[in-house]
Design a protein with these regions (language model features):
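Residue-level hotspots within the lipid-embedded alpha helices of multi-pass solute transporters
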Residues: 19-23, 56, 96, 100, ...
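N-terminal transmembrane alpha-helices
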Residues: 3-31, 35-36, 52-64, 96-100, ...
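Small-residue hotspots at the loop-to-helix junctions and early N-terminal turns
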Residues: 38-49, 126, 130, 189, ...
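Helix-terminus/linker motif at the lipid-water interface of multi-pass membrane proteins
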Residues: 24-42, 111-120, 176-183, 244-277, ...
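Transmembrane helical elements of multi-pass membrane transporters/channels
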Residues: 10-29, 132, 143, 166, ...
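Small-residue-rich hydrophobic transmembrane alpha-helices
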Residues: 41-101, 140-159, 254, 265-331, ...
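Short runs within selected transmembrane alpha-helices of multi-pass transporters and secretion channels
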Residues: 62, 132-151, 159-170, 188-203, ...
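Short alpha-helical transmembrane segments in multi-pass integral membrane proteins
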Residues: 1-15, 69-136, 180-237, 293-358, ...
Length: 443
């Protein structure tokens, strides 16, 4: 398998700008929602934290499909790529519809179980927003399935353009819903639903294009292919379990952060928004590893897989250094727009320094490299390591550093970095061991 520098650039740059766009639009959305009132902001924020679990599940499912599709593309078995794509779409629809129905039925019960202590106005905002956003689950899952197909073919510019159009629809819709129709929380929820439906329709239409290397065929969508579906789920389920437990630990740690006082909670919240921006390189490179390494393994070209593991790691590290230094340099400028005390701003800057340092030296090995290992079929090992590291290292050290050593949110950040470092060491050793070469995703 051969990927030229131009091929890699054409994959990486659109993915990076797509993720950056999503991040910036998220900030704009929060700004627009703030005009509805504090209850709306709180309600949307709480529901988004709940919806994140489902987003990760749909992403895990799509990633499983991407690994299988990439390997079949590498082996040049076009009919099997179409079978895998069709089964991914079929299961994504069924799975997301089931979740949508469950959330619509148990909407209020779930919210009161999770956020029962919030004020009534916030709870009503939560109920309204969740009911509307639940209808977008199938659209989100369908889009992820189609995006996985296009990314497996290294056609990332397509998903970038769809994302641009979708986010423009979302922003304009939010402005109309909030400032023209004065629809409150619903004025923010419906544009998101419309934007996701738009993305799902466009990507699905494009995926039926028979001139593509792999494409949707009705005969593969309207049938239950147990063997092919099993191959997809063998990758998706461990990844979904890993991401689910990771989210649960994050929720648990948010209750620990709540013990540290107002200024530390505020600093942690602002720092996390900057961390998300700094983490874009790792988020971008994950799908690139899946596509490239997946195709190499499908072609049974172990030498090329070794070569691109090393090349992509070099790109990730260099890109991470440049981006994280840039974010660190502009952090003081960003902090000028926050109405925070000097003490809080100083704490934010310390947290960003800690994060960006380890995001450069450890996360490339704990994040993108692990996606490469998953693309070879080495999913159970990465799942077990990630779960143990998340629970034991991040969870326990957060309590020790944050509470016992009285380091507060700095302790939480150090525990997070220790988690990354542990995974980085173990995954690097796993790569060096060559055990990942022994796995088989497709027959």
């Amino acid at each position: 398998m051969t990927f030229t520098n131009k091929d890699l650039k054409n994959m990486i740059i659109p993915l990076f700008f797509e993720q950056l766009l999503v991040m910036l639009v998220g900030i704009i959305d929060t700004f627009i929602v703030s005009f509805v009132g504090e209850s709306a902001v709180s309600g949307v924020s709480l529901v988004n934290s709940f919806n994140t679990v489902f987003i990760y599940l749909f992403t895990a499912l799509a990633s499983g499909g991407a690994v299988v599709i990439s390997q079949y593309i590498g082996r040049k078995e076009n009919e099997d790529t179409n079978r895998a794509s069709g089964q991914l779409l079929m299961f994504s629809i069924i799975f997301s519809l089931a979740l949508m129905i469950l959330v619509l039925i148990f909407n209020e019960s779930l919210l009161r179980l999770l956020f029962g202590r919030v004020e009534n106005s916030v709870m009503q905002a939560c109920i309204t927003y969740l009911k509307i956003s639940a209808y977008s689950y199938p659209a989100l899952a369908i889009y992820n399935a189609g995006a996985a197909l296009y990314r497996s073919m290294a056609k990332t510019s397509t998903t970038m353009y769809i994302s641009i159009a979708s986010n423009i629809i979302n922003c304009i819709g939010n402005c109309i819903g909030v400032f023209v129709l004065h629809a409150g929380v619903a004025g923010v929820a419906y544009p998101s639903l419309i934007a996701r439906v738009f993305s799902a329709i466009v990507i699905t239409f494009l995926c039926f294009n028979k001139t593509l290397t792999t494409y949707y065929e009705k005969k593969h969508i309207l049938v239950f292919d147990a063997k092919m579906l099993k191959r997809v789920l063998n990758i998706a389920v461990p990844n979904g379990i890993e991401q689910g437990i990771f989210q649960l630990v994050k929720v648990a740690l948010s209750s620990v952060v709540a013990l540290f006082g107002t200024y530390q909670i505020a600093a942690n919240g602002v720092a996390q928004s900057i961390w998300s921006l700094a983490a874009l390189v790792g988020v971008t490179m994950g799908p690139v590893f899946i596509t490239v390494i997946g195709q190499c393994m499908g072609a049974e070209d172990i030498d090329s897989a070794h070569y691109y593991f090393k090349k992509l790691m070099k790109i990730t590290i260099i890109f991470s250094v440049i981006w994280n230094v840039f974010i660190l340099l502009i952090t003081p400028l960003l902090l000028q727009y926050y109405q925070l005390s000097s003490e809080t701003k100083n704490l934010v800057f310390i947290l960003v320094i800690i994060h960006n340092l380890f995001n450069t030296i450890a996360f490339p090995f704990s994040g993108p490299l692990s996606n490469g290992l998953r693309a070879t079929g080495d999913v159970k090992y990465t799942m077990i390591v990630s779960i143990l590291s998340t629970v034991v290292v991040r969870g326990i050290l957060s309590i020790i550093f944050g509470i016992t050593f009285n380091l507060g949110v700095i302790g939480i950040a150090l525990a997070m970095c220790a988690d990354w470092s542990m995974r980085a060491i173990v995954f690097h050793l796993r790569y060096k061991s060559d055990k990942w070469t022994q796995f088989s995703v497709i027959e």
